[in-house]
Amino acid sequence: MLVLLLALPGCAFDKFTPPPVSPVLIANARPDHADPQTLSRGRAIFVSRCLECHTLPAVTKHSPGEWPHLVSRMSGRANLSAGEQAAIVAYLRAASLTGR
């Protein structure tokens, strides 16, 4: 029974929590010209669409430059629009700098 529970997709068993949209995260988003609404949307989509299928490492595990490729690669599985991808990338790029 325990093995079955651990194998369920969509169950997050690690301790990773995506960082909130904070003043520091907003400041880190300046190179992407992302506003707080875009960052909040990106975080919400990340939580609802990415974390529903699998757990992810802390956002700091990847550099800001790696996130566009990673999101693009996974976007087909999550059926993400170009706008959703852009919001997620903006959030993850800023978040990856926030925790460093």
Regions found by a protein language model. Give the residues of each.
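C-terminal capping alpha-helices of c-type cytochrome domains
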Residues: 78-100
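The canonical Cys-X-X-Cys-His
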Residues: 47-56, 88
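C-terminal motif of bacterial Sec signal peptides marking the signal peptidase cleavage site
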Residues: 7-10
